[in-house]
Amino acid sequence: MGLLSEGSPLSWEETKALADHVREHGVNQFINLYHRLKDRQGDILKWGDEVEYIIVKFDDEQKVARVALRAQDLLAQLNEKELADPNGVKSLWRPEYGAYMIEGTPGKPFGGLMAHFNLVEANMRYRREEVTELLAKDECVMSITNFPRLGAPNFTYPLAQPRPEDPLSSARSLYFPDEAIFPGHPRFKTLTRNIRKRRGEKVSIKLKVFKDTKTKLPVEGAPPGEPDVVLLDAMGFGMGCCCLQLTFQACNITEARRLYDQLAPLCPIMLALTAASPIYRGYLTESDCRWNVISSSVDCRTEEERGLAPLDQQKFRIAKSRYDSIDSYLSPEGAKYNDVPLTYDEKVYQRLVEGGIDHLLAQHVAHLFIRDTVSLFSEKVHQNDNEDTDHFENIQSTNWQTMRFKPPPPNSSIGWRVEFRPCEAQISDFENAAIVCFVVLLTRVILSYQLNFLTPISKVDENMQTAQKRDACRKEKFWFRKSSKTTEQRAAKAQAQAQAQAKAQAQTNGKATLNGNGLANGNGNGSENSDQEEQQPLTNGSAKMNGHGSGTTNGTNGSSNGSSNGTDSDHTDTDDEENELFQLLSINEIFNGKPNVFPGLVPLIRSYLQSMEVDTDTHCTIEQYLRFIQKRAAGELITTATWMREQVLSHPDYKQDSVVSERINYDLLKRIQGIQEGKQVEPALLGQDYHSKTKTKDFIPPALQKQLAKNGCCEEK
């Protein structure tokens, strides 16, 4: 969930008094960090996923399912392996907001080998099994985005009751007890309390109820004058949801900024594809996704900042919550698509510019810094700005956006990274692995083909709202950039060059660095390099990418320094192309293509893969993932959200009143348990026998490792 500093949390009054102190020193820390690391080059591709889980307890006698408040106990046991052998564990476990939630990641990041795609699902299975071994027979670990009856009466085990009138309560919620907040670190309750106090009132999350034939209005707890609203009133309703996130290491800062920008327009598209949360507080709603719920759950803006009162005590009108979609692009190519006025702190901006930060990055940081810190620890108030970054991370980590631009940590081997944050958690490891591998492959296609998905920020914002509508994946259309002839020619040229070079290299010395076991890192990998570069042979430095081969042509320096060096022109559209660049496309058209408009994300990935030699098992696994993505995008398979709705609407106990009763909730979660264990076949959701199709393994076979070593692409151990 972000920075977990150790120490004693300050009260809101103490934290508020230090807001400018944190802001001033956070800016200084970023400037110092930037100048230390801005010229860092040559980091290899590394990537990893984060899956959040909910622990569910079943009462099979009473036919009731509740969230089990066991996270602290489970984490203590799960972390024993890491403490004993930090470098040898296959998974890492961290706390999340809910006392019923845990977050799992791979023990080590995956790298640039094609074979790594075959490890992801197996590692996810291992994580699930690792937790399951610690659970009682009536408990289950589930990768569901939201517990359907979160906030309904008696939803926790042990039972806990909200205390809205208790001044010592962090949430003061009518529905969400403090006991459901993770107790093992003070950050979570501190954030809950301080967000409420800064706002001046409890957070207000409003969802339209799904109106069925017998839905009773007003909904229980609905605000005055809004009878059809399901009201949620605590941070836990949002931060108590689970998601699926990915982080990529770029070769340098320029590539990180480009990836940040190119992936941002895809965030609402992936949100719609992964929609998985239609039920809140035991009611079917008109929303399929968690995003606006979380956004409202941490909205600490005052009435002045929200435009409900004249500015007096506050400096800014702020358009969005601190949890929302990005507000500006970072790369030079994206600048002209920053079409929404950006609110930022002018003093912070000037300090950054004077400190040597360029305009686009300076306004991005200055925009983050319009927010006050909402969590501060006494031991972290005074820091060394030349070495520490906690004040910067304090603000950075509490701006939860669809994308996150992440500088390297101090004194670390980790490079510049970007985090992809919109996806909802899926029921099965197969689905989660498919989403992860698809997005990683897409980043390689973007860099290798120099694709341009840049879309005006205003249209991306519009897409974010569209993505959350009921059954948006099948019914809605999204603003998307048309493919240009330049893009199509570039992709075809890159593919042809890669295949020709691989063949030539193999014939020349038998040591083909383009053996298909590597993935490109470095935005110089596009086909539009100079003629001189294109004629140069593939040396170890240019092709191996520090042990990770490239699928396309690249420059001579291996890491392709990611600088502009003529590549910016690949992203610059002609005046003719600027006309009617953007069209409303369906999810099917975006993923599978529309003739003469856009080739489709999946066909682009398949084109890229044709230039790579992939071992048989990995090829089989990737193919199953791509087919799954294609079928869901086409509507042949339904989203988790749609499947959940259908399960509720067809349940014999459902009374056409929008209510998900305890029995319906129990049966739904039991069915989900069967799916994730491979015992329940759901053709509409996953097709037939999905779980037996992939060839996922938790290791790279020895024979393949020998081949990789022979070809100079050694697997890191």
From Swiss-Prot:
Reaction catalyzed: L-cysteine + L-glutamate + ATP = gamma-L-glutamyl-L-cysteine + ADP + phosphate + H(+); (2S)-2-aminobutanoate + L-glutamate + ATP = gamma-L-glutamyl-(2S)-2-aminobutanoate + ADP + phosphate + H(+)
EC code(s) of this entry: 6.3.2.2
A GO term for molecular function: ATP binding
Pathway terms, separated by semicolons: Sulfur metabolism; glutathione biosynthesis; glutathione from L-cysteine and L-glutamate: step 1/2
GO biological process, one term: response to copper ion
Superkingdom of source: Eukaryota
UniProt keyword annotations, A-Z: ATP-binding, Glutathione biosynthesis, Ligase, Nucleotide-binding
Enzyme class: ligase
Pfam families: GCS
InterPro entries: GCS, Gln_synth/guanido_kin_cat_dom
Region entry Disordered, spans: 484-576
GO CC, alphabetical: glutamate-cysteine ligase complex; nucleus; perinuclear region of cytoplasm
Low complexity composition-biased segments: 492-518, 551-567
Function: Catalyzes the ATP-dependent ligation of L-glutamate and L-cysteine and participates in the first and rate-limiting step in glutathione biosynthesis.
UniProt record similarity statement: Belongs to the glutamate--cysteine ligase type 3 family.
PANTHER family on file: GLUTAMATE CYSTEINE LIGASE (PTHR11164), GLUTAMATE--CYSTEINE LIGASE CATALYTIC SUBUNIT (PTHR11164:SF0)
Name assigned to this protein: Glutamate--cysteine ligase
Organism in which the protein naturally occurs: Drosophila melanogaster (Fruit fly)
